[in-house]
UniProtKB/Swiss-Prot annotation:
<comment type="similarity">
    <text>Belongs to the Pup ligase/Pup deamidase family. Pup-conjugating enzyme subfamily.</text>
</comment>
<dbReference type="GO" id="GO:0000287">
    <property type="term" value="F:magnesium ion binding"/>
</dbReference>
<feature type="binding site">
    <location>
        <position position="53"/>
    </location>
    <ligand>
        <name>ATP</name>
    </ligand>
</feature>
<keyword id="KW-0436">Ligase</keyword>
<feature type="binding site">
    <location>
        <position position="63"/>
    </location>
    <ligand>
        <name>Mg(2+)</name>
    </ligand>
</feature>
<dbReference type="GO" id="GO:0070490">
    <property type="term" value="P:protein pupylation"/>
</dbReference>
<protein>
    <recommendedName>
        <fullName>Pup--protein ligase</fullName>
        <ecNumber>6.3.1.19</ecNumber>
    </recommendedName>
</protein>
<keyword id="KW-0067">ATP-binding</keyword>
<feature type="binding site">
    <location>
        <position position="66"/>
    </location>
    <ligand>
        <name>ATP</name>
    </ligand>
</feature>
<keyword id="KW-0479">Metal-binding</keyword>
<feature type="binding site">
    <location>
        <position position="55"/>
    </location>
    <ligand>
        <name>Mg(2+)</name>
    </ligand>
</feature>
<comment type="pathway">
    <text>Protein modification; protein pupylation.</text>
</comment>
<keyword id="KW-0833">Ubl conjugation pathway</keyword>
<dbReference type="GO" id="GO:0019787">
    <property type="term" value="F:ubiquitin-like protein transferase activity"/>
</dbReference>
<keyword id="KW-0547">Nucleotide-binding</keyword>
<comment type="pathway">
    <text>Protein degradation; proteasomal Pup-dependent pathway.</text>
</comment>
<keyword id="KW-0460">Magnesium</keyword>
Length: 454
């Protein structure tokens, strides 16, 4: 596919610190957080004027699903816009709590685990052609996704019986299957439930749920951009070496816990490779493919360069070449510097707090955003693009139709129903408009509906 639709769904961790007032359960805090949303949307599951979906997921985790994007920079801007939208809700919830005598602080974290060992996810969506065997696609992708944490992990302090250690991935220890139609019970690498949110005759949606939530824009670019490149190769019929793993679930944990990237992974055919060797195989294939076919977007040169530099950094043990671009390396540098300054071990409570605060989405409290304000991390998009994405949908996809409809209906106070493919005014006998093509940003039926609304 020359153009692909992308989306990222992010579940956020929520907590409330209250030294001087009674504690609140996450469920209670979430209700305060969504009170404004429920007041105008009559639900805690709404679509916004930027085409995105905002809702409370299982376990009172606020979740933001970006609108359909057809460009990686656009996707990152809309993913970051979700943080701003939720951060505004935090401020409003804070004011309401204070007015009711609660003097604590609400925190939202873009991470994947909490102190109780619960896990919540970051799910990627890729539109793929219906043709071809999905099982073959999964076989090719799973070895890549299991080892992708080397180039896209968020980093985490892992408590073990032998003490604390630093791991590549937050999500790796919470994945239990290779492929499955469930997302919460079994937590697979790839979710196989067939919900394309598009014309099912032509398209399928690849739903990847193994990845970490990323604070770094360049890491997010790597996470999605590398999968896009591999999908392009598969769609072009490139033959890939068989790297199916004997036990991908055991392997994903072993890889996360081994910062050298050299732990041997047993393949289904009995051979053994390291995570670095597996990643190199994919990188070499993609590099050759791009050399023959050209880069299909402006981000490809950076993706290939950073992919190469990250693997080289792991091989050499010198991460100074990537510690402004890859989440786990940025975080590790921060921790190592703090530990050295204060003479602390990895198991120190202050280091655990640092690990968590890195993921605080507050632009004034969060450690990642403190680094960003100092110019200590590399960016993909600028603040203007992110702020624009808070209100405006992507102009090149179906999200424009949805966002424009939601905006007009809200301005006029009309009762409406929307989802990823349907638009409907409830206070009129209009038929539901079905928008099955996610690439289509112009639709005469939607134009007529908007005009008829006044």
């Amino acid at each position: 596919m020359d153009k692909r639709i992308f989306g990222i769904e992010t579940e956020f961790g929520i907590s409330y610190s209250s030294p001087d007032s009674r504690p609140l359960a996450p469920e209670e805090v979430a209700r305060y957080l969504f009170r404004k949303v429920v007041s105008w949307g009559r639900s805690s599951n709404v679509f916004l004027t930027n085409g995105s979906r905002l809702y409370l997921d299982v376990g009172s985790h606020p979740e933001y699903a970006t609108a359909e994007c057809d460009d990686l920079g656009q996707l990152i801007a809309h993913d970051r816009a979700g943080e701003l939208i939720l951060d505004d809700l935090v401020d409003e919830a804070q004011e309401r709590l204070a007015a009711e005598g609660f003097n604590g602080t609400v925190y939202l974290f873009k991470n994947n685990t909490d102190s109780a060992g619960n896990s919540y996810g970051s799910h990627e969506n890729y539109l793929i052609p219906r043709r071809g065997e999905f099982s073959r696609l999964a076989e090719i992708l799973i070895p890549f996704l299991v080892t992708r944490q080397l180039i896209a992990g968020a980093g985490k302090i892992l408590k073990t019986p032998h003490g604390a250690t630093f791991a590549f991935s937050q999500r790796a220890d919470h994945i239990w299957e290779g492929v499955s139609s469930a997302t919460t019970r079994s937590r697979p690498i790839i979710n196989t439930r067939d919900e394309p949110h598009a014309d099912a005759e032509f398209y399928r949606r690849l739903h990847v749920i193994v990845g970490d939530s990323n604070m770094s824009e360049t890491t997010a670019l790597m996470k999605v951009g590398t999968v896009d490149l591999i999908l392009r190769m598969i769609e072009a019929g490139v033959i890939m070496r068989d790297m199916r793993m004997e036990n991908p679930i055991r392997s994903i944990r072993e890889i996360s816990h081994d910062l050298s990237g050299r732990a041997l992974i047993r393949l289904a055919n009995g051979r053994q490779l390291t995570a670095l060797e597996i990643q190199r195989e994919y990188l070499n294939k993609v590099t050759s493919f791009v050399a023959e076919n050209g880069a299909h977007n402006q981000h490809v040169p950076l993706i290939l360069d950073l992919w190469e530099r990250t693997l080289t950094a792991i091989e050499s043990g010198d991460t100074s070449t990537i510690d402004t671009e890859i989440d786990w390396a940025i975080k590790k540098k921060l921790m190592d510097s703090y530990r050295k300054r204060h003479g602390l071990g990895l198991d120190a409570p202050r280091i655990a707090q640092l690990d968590l605060t890195y993921h605080d989405i507050s632009r004034t409290r969060g450690l990642y955003y403190l680094l960003q304000s100092r110019g200590a991390v590399r960016r993909v998009v600028d603040d203007t693009a992110v702020k624009d994405a808070v209100d405006a949908p992507p102009q090149t996809t179906r999200a424009k139709l949805r966002g424009d409809f939601v905006r007009r209906a809200q301005e006029l106070g009309r009762d409406y129903t929307v989802d990823w493919v349907h638009l409907k005014l409830n206070d009129r006998a209009h038929q539901t408009i079905l928008c099955k093509d996610p690439f289509r940003n112009v639709d005469e039926r939607v134009d007529a509906l908007l005009d008829s609304m006044g």
